[in-house]
């Protein structure tokens, strides 16, 4: 996978196939790497990257702060993930694209629709995260990281984070103690040195705010309902059904997005035999709609 400086952040990405572009925000929560489209859970089963590239240019990437991509210590919101993806499309020369998200990737996908509707051909939201259990577990994740920093003291707390990540090599999703920048700390020594040099109290305040505002509701985060209700972009929603991907979160998005289609198929019946074809049908209709509108 090539690397480019995208929005000032070193970004690993890959372009697969040909046709209209699809920017694909990977599943995997806080470990959203391009390979998850092939290796994780339902995505390994439905094999979208065996089918979509036959008709579309699929842009897959390690999201900022994930995998081999870099990051920046700041109070990250969904708008930052949108800016990262937008800069990647700009780098590749794509003016408009379908935006697809899996899992937590649905949040910036929904945000795209309200922030840059003129650049979005359609939105695909596969297993959107959300629900009361998701909010609770997400806040617990940030709390565990903050507790680890606190337990190691003001002088050693951030160094302890770097030491842990260097030794264990786990992402924030795998071990909350390593925090939201664990993946970058693992492979970027200069970033790690700057991370340790921060004021630890200011850092803790930043993390508290990040966790509270990133996952701020008991349904699908990413965009405000009032903004989505005014969104005139075709959307395709596929529900999950577990503690991180409550079916209610998918239903909420369907309620809020006026031009959305809700594929009411149980998780067990989402297979390679039916899912890629259904998704390609939706994308073809969205392309036809955009063409008729002169998009």
What are these model-derived regions, one by one?
Residues 101-105, 109:
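Gly/Ala-rich beta-loop-alpha elbow adjacent to hydrolase catalytic centers
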Residues 180-223:
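Hydrophobic, aromatic-rich cap/lid helix
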Residues 114-115, 120-152:
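Flexible "cap/lid" loop of the alpha/beta hydrolase fold
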Residues 243-249:
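Conserved alpha/beta-hydrolase "acid-adjacent" motif
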Residues 255-295:
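Catalytic active-site module of serine/aspartate enzymes centered on a nucleophile-bearing elbow/loop
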Residues 79-97:
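Conserved acidic catalytic loop of the alpha/beta-hydrolase fold
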Residues 230-231, 237-239:
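Short beta-strand/loop motif that positions the catalytic acidic residue
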Residues 6-70:
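Conserved HGGG/HGGXW glycine-rich cap/lid loop of the alpha/beta-hydrolase fold
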């Amino acid at each position: 996978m090539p690397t480019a400086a995208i929005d000032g952040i070193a970004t690993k990405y890959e372009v697969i196939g040909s046709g209209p572009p699809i920017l694909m925000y990977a599943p995997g929560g806080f470990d959203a790497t391009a390979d998850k489209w092939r290796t994780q859970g339902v995505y390994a089963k439905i094999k979208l990257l065996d089918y979509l590239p036959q008709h579309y240019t699929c842009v897959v990437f390690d999201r900022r702060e994930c995998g081999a991509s870099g990051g920046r210590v700041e109070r990250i919101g969904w708008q930052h993930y949108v800016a990262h993806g937008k800069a990647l499309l700009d780098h590749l020369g794509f003016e408009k694209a379908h935006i697809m998200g899996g899992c937590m990737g649905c949040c910036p996908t929904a945000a795209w629709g309200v922030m840059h509707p003129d650049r979005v051909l359609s939105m695909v939201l596969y297993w959107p995260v959300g629900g009361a259990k998701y909010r609770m577990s997400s806040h617990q994740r940030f709390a565990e990281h903050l507790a680890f920093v606190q337990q190691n003291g003001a002088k050693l707390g951030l160094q302890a984070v770097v030491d842990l990540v260097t030794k264990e090599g786990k992402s924030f999703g795998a071990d909350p103690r390593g925090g939201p920048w664990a993946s970058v700390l693992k492979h970027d020594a200069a970033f790690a040195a700057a991370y340790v040099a921060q004021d630890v109290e200011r850092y803790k305040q930043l993390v508290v705010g990040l966790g509270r505002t990133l996952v701020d509701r008991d349904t699908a985060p990413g965009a405000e309902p009032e903004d989505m209700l005014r969104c005139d972009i075709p959307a395709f929603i596929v529900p999950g059904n577990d503690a991180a991907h409550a079916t209610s979160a998918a239903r909420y998005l369907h309620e809020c997005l006026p031009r959305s289609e809700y594929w009411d198929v149980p998780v067990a019946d989402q297979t390679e035999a039916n899912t890629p074809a259904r998704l390609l049908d939706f994308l073809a209709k969205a392309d036809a709609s955009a063409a008729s509108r002169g998009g």
